[in-house]
């Protein structure tokens, strides 16, 4: 017999009308965190649409925090900025690793993009612009995470967990090791 089931989660979960179960993204992250790291951990999920900090204690969701509806602290922001620089997301991280941070002070994607355009117009090094862009997202994620009392084990999920550079920068900002998912 086939014991397989379909579970839908995330923003598109309501569109999967054939799902056997619908489970919130936060609950799924907590279950994954528990499997990876045990009953006490924090999950930082930097997705395309939002950023979530999920605290797991006793194997259950203890608390969570989401960013506001602005995309400036998300993967989408980095995609937009990489596109503006004419590079892929991976190339953006590679460039950032070689650059010196140029500050991106705007909290809004549209205004931050204007800052990037101005830097390009000034002839600033693309590596420095890339470093500023990645640093900006890491700052926003760290500020959200530091609103919570993070346990020793912190896991990074979402597309940015594929970037060793972003993981390194976020770890520095939090003052503790952040482990990417495998």
Per-segment meaning from a language model:
Residues 58-104, 108:
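Glycine-rich phosphate-binding loop plus the immediately following alpha-helix
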Residues 60, 125, 146-153, 173-178:
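Short, surface-exposed connector motifs at secondary-structure boundaries
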Residues 19, 23-27, 170-182:
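Conserved phosphate-binding/catalytic loops in two-lobed NTP-binding clefts
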Residues 11-12, 150-173, 181-182:
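Glycine-rich phosphate-binding loops at beta-strand->alpha-helix junctions
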Residues 1-7, 50-52, 81:
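Conserved phosphate-binding loops in N-terminal lobes of ATP-dependent enzymes
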Residues 12-44, 49, 54-59, 142, ...:
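Conserved phosphate-binding catalytic cores of ATP/NTP-utilizing and phosphoryl-transfer enzymes
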Residues 31, 75-79, 179-182:
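Glycine-rich phosphate-binding/hydrolytic loop that grips phosphoryl groups
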Residues 112-146, 150:
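Adenine-nucleotide phosphate-binding core of ATP-dependent small-molecule kinases
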């Amino acid at each position: 017999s086939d014991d397989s089931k379909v579970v839908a989660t995330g923003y598109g979960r309501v569109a999967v009308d054939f799902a056997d179960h619908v489970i919130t993204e936060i609950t799924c992250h907590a279950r994954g965190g528990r499997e990876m790291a045990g009953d006490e951990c924090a999950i930082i999920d930097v997705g395309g649409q939002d950023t979530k900090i999920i605290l797991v204690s006793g194997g259950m969701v203890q608390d969570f925090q989401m960013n506001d509806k602005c995309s400036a602290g998300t993967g989408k922001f980095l995609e937009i900025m990489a596109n503006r620089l004419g590079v892929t997301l991976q190339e953006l991280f590679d460039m950032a690793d070689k650059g010196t941070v140029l500050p991106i002070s705007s909290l809004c994607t549209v205004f931050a993009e204007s800052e990037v355009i101005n830097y390009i117009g000034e002839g600033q090094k693309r590596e420095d612009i890339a470093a500023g862009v990645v640093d900006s997202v890491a700052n926003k994620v760290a500020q959200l995470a530091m609103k919570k009392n993070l346990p020793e084990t912190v896991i990074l999920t979402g597309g940015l967990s594929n970037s060793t550079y972003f993981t390194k920068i976020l770890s520095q900002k939090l003052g503790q090791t952040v482990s990417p998912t495998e």
